[in-house]
Every structure is written in C-alpha cells, then in structure tokens.
C-alpha cells in the first residue's frame, strides 16, 4: 500500500517539477495545469480511488447485487482511469484539442476495460507458474468478475473487440495532420497488454 501511495505522490512531484520548469511561452503553463488536473481527477475519488472504493464495497454485496453497470463503473475507474490519464496528459502537453482528448480518453477506456477483462480471464485460465501470482482467487473469494457475469466466450470476444476499437482509434488520430496513419509501437503495446499471458 505504501508503494502505491509513494508512486502516486511521485507522479504529482514529477508533474509539479515539469510545471515549474515550463517556459513562460503562451499556452505552456495552462497546459501544464490542465495535465495536473487530469492526473488528480483520474487518480482521485472520480477515478482510481473511487473505483477501488467501489470494488471494495462490492465485495461485501451479495453476488446478485453486483450488476454489469456497477462492474463497468469499477473497471472504468479502478483500471482504465490511469491508462486514460497517461494518454491524455501527453496529448495535453503537446497541445491536443479537447475533441482529441475525448477520443484519447475513449481509447484509454477501451484499453483499460480490455486489460481488466483479460486479467479476469487469466485468473481462471492461467497458473501460478505462468502468472506469477495466485490464480483462482476471484472464484475462491466469490468475487463477481466480467467472466462470471458474461461467460468466458463472450469475455474473450469483448477483449478482442475493445482492443480493435482502441487500435482503430489510435490509427484515426495518427492519420490527422499528415500522419502516417499507424503508430506501430502503440498498436503492439496495446496488443501486448491485452493478449498477455501474465
């Protein structure tokens, strides 16, 4: 827990250091402030911490009370929020438009949801030796997951659909302003995050 607290504070420290070093050219300081706001929102009660809190509270609910809507809220905030922020912050600092930020936020949501669903799949299909952590814990603890609500086949298809949507969105952004239309590094990164075996 302390490591997580330390890393979160280090993110703010790094952002503040960048803010302090920003040149006073027009637009740079407001972009730094906007980037720090995104970091605070996506890490805070309307992001990761809020999602983790909802996840902890959901563990106390009877399984039938954990709906698809609640699970989506948890995954969008606990998992996807920091992926969204990492994509949005770089774009803000580069001068992206609000419309581009919304698209990147959606891409981050797709990646985060696919990552979490894949994590739920691996908890069932992998082993301690491969994954490096105990498997089967969700089932043992009667934790509702995407797989337990929707089944394995649908979950695998949803991971693929979300990853394809994310890659399509990245390609669309890469085509703008004379871009090449593909960012192979990001496509491989997204695919590796989502198809990982551990």
Language-model features, listed with the residues they occupy:
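C-terminal domain/tail detector
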Residues: 192-198
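Mg2+-dependent prenyl diphosphate-binding active-site environment of isoprenoid biosynthetic enzymes
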Residues: 1-171, 179-191
């Amino acid at each position: 827990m302390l490591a997580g607290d330390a890393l979160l504070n280090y993110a703010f420290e790094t952002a503040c250091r960048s803010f302090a070093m920003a040149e006073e050219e027009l637009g740079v300081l407001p972009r730094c402030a906007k980037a720090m706001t995104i970091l605070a929102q996506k890490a805070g009660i309307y992001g990761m911490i809020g999602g983790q809190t909802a996840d902890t509270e959901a563990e106390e609910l009877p399984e039938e009370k954990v709906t698809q809507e609640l699970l989506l809220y948890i995954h969008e905030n606990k998992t996807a929020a920091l992926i969204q922020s990492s994509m949005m912050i770089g774009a803000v600092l580069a001068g992206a438009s609000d419309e581009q930020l919304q698209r990147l936020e959606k891409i981050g949501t797709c990646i985060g949801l696919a990552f979490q669903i894949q994590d739920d799949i691996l908890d069932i299909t992998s082993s301690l030796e491969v994954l490096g952590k105990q498997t089967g814990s969700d089932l043992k603890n009667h934790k509702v997951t995407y797989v337990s609500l929707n089944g394995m086949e649908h979950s695998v298809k949803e991971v693929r659909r979300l990853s394809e949507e994310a890659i399509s969105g990245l390609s669309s952004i890469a085509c703008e302003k004379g871009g090449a239309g593909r960012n192979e590094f990001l496509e491989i990164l997204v695919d590796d995050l989502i198809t990982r075996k551990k």
